Amino acid sequence: MMRGAAPTGVVSVMVLMILVLLKQIESASANGSSLGLPPRKFCNIYQGSWVYDKSYPLYDSKNCPFIERQFNCKSNGRPDSEYLKYRWQPSGCNLPRFNGLDFLGRIMKGKKLMFVGDSLSLNQWQSLTCLLHNAAPKANSTSTRSPSGLSVFSFPAYNSSIMFSRNAFLVDIVGAPPKRVMKLDSISSGSLWKTADVLVFNSWHWWLHTDRKQPWDAIMSGNVTVKDMDRLVAYEKAMMTWAKWIDQNIDPSKTKVFFQGISPDHGRAREWSKQGGKGSCIGETKPIMGSSYLAGPHAAEMVVAKVIKTMKNQARLMDVTLMSQLRKDGHPSVYGFGGHRMADCSHWCLSGVPDSWNQLLYSELFHS
């Protein structure tokens, strides 16, 4: 042994100590404590603000072949790009940066994740498929869509599937026009939900549709059938049915259940600006800075929170409403499906805001 050289055993111990230290640093970075912030479990990741980050977006939309035309704003001619450069920053901690390989190889290996809801769930599902494709571009993947409305994106190497089931109301609609009845007390599609290891539900926007866009002709609550009722009341009744179904049919030790909070639209500028007038999301290129929204909490958001509190095995509320309210710039506007004929202030551009929703979902699963 050379003079001054440490014994082999000592070197091994030192190497082990360094590896442990690096692991602690990595863990600290993930939950924010490396910056003196409290651990993730003491932090509300849904309270925060948008900060400019030149490393964003997390993927280039032109490299994701799965994006539907209505969400592909850059391909549809949107000229500005600053809206892509904002990252969600919780007030009291840091989020782990989305790691697609960790998501596939550890969190979701051998498992199925299912988004259940309307086109906002489609928005989030497509975002996640793009994030994962970007992380593993050479991994073999398959994408299928059945007539029943189930879309499946699979990674055979990881035995993992990311699914989307189109179901805008969660409760049943039976019959054919002009006798279609929405049954607020009935769920018959739940057998499909039981096949997933992670469920992410969403429902709201279609509850506001009227006239020809309304996919039902009457509403049944209990034994009473009416032509119409207050939509927020109907929504709460349906969400209570959903909550009871989850409590009775889902084992929380085997399946994680999330409810994606209400995704807002930005069709009325007066909701975020006192000088808003009759404006909308058209021409908006920057988010609202800070952590407050002029119009305040969303009524449907409060209904969802109320319903979840009644559950025996509470679903986790992904309360994305405020963070999304602050992103008046993130919609397709006139660069969505149909072009300049109609402004879309409800859905979101991809890349864009749904990527941050999925980063929050990743954080929830990362720490669970």
Swiss-Prot record:
Which GO-annotated molecular functions does the record name?
O-acetyltransferase activity
Cellular component (GO) terms are: Golgi apparatus; membrane
Sequence similarity: Belongs to the PC-esterase family. TBL subfamily.
> What Pfam families does UniProt report for this protein, alphabetically?
PC-Esterase, PMR5N
The short motif DCXHWCLPGXXDXWN motif is annotated over 344-358
Give the domain of life. Answer: Eukaryota
What stretches pass through the bilayer?
Answer: 9-25
Coiled-coil stretches are: none
Q: Does the keyword Membrane apply?
A: yes
Q: Does the keyword Protein transport apply?
A: no
UniProt gene name: TBL43
Query: Under what name is this protein listed?
Result: Protein trichome birefringence-like 43
A further note on this protein reads: Contains 2 motifs that are conserved in esterases, but it is unlikely that this protein belongs to the catalytically active pectin esterases.
Alphabetical UniProt keywords: Membrane, Signal-anchor, Transmembrane, Transmembrane helix
Q: Where in the cell is it found?
A: Membrane
Q: Which InterPro entries match?
A: TBL, TBL_C, TBL_N
Membrane topology term = Single-pass type II membrane protein
The job of this chain, per UniProt, is described as: May act as a bridging protein that binds pectin and other cell wall polysaccharides. Probably involved in maintaining esterification of pectins. May be involved in the specific O-acetylation of cell wall polymers.
Q: Where is this motif: GDS motif?
A: 117-119
Where mainly located? membrane
